[in-house]
Amino acid sequence: MSRGGIQGFESERLSQILAARRLSQAQLAALVGVSPATVSKWRSGNQAPERETLERLAGVVNVTPEWFTRAPSAKVSLPLFRSNASAHVAARAMLEARMEWAQDVALALSEFVDYPTLNLPTRQFKEPDEITPDEIELAASECRDLWRIGRTAVPDLALAIEGAGVVLIREETGISQIEGLSAW
């Protein structure tokens, strides 16, 4: 930081919270009682909020002040959205930020819980466009064999994929244009 404020403020966390709460810098500034330029400086890393301001900021967005000083975990991949073309950029940004939080939680939990070993068929696709319906059918068949779940209806698919080592998060988002997303 070049000027003032608390030590260790992670500007990436501010970007995450803006996306996750679907707030503009100006809206957040009004809620916290600072200028939009100040929020811009926090976001760029040129300035950090003072302790009292950080507490107001945290209260407004419903996180602890300490959360803004935690380094974000490394992104595993860009999310792949299952959505129609009309899905708004802000909605995608919100879900991407929330996925990053889910990854943070899963990583923290892994310190206390042993996740099952990942047990999925391997594919060499580089782009989602390369995946054909036949490839999906083949992968589904391989999953059924790997997981020993037979060829009949799967009573609890979420339980089956969690047992195969996949971390599954289910959340009602209120964004009807996006049916789901994944990252690896």
Report each predicted region and the residues it spans.
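Short juxta-domain linker segments that transition from a proline/glycine-rich
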Residues: 1-184
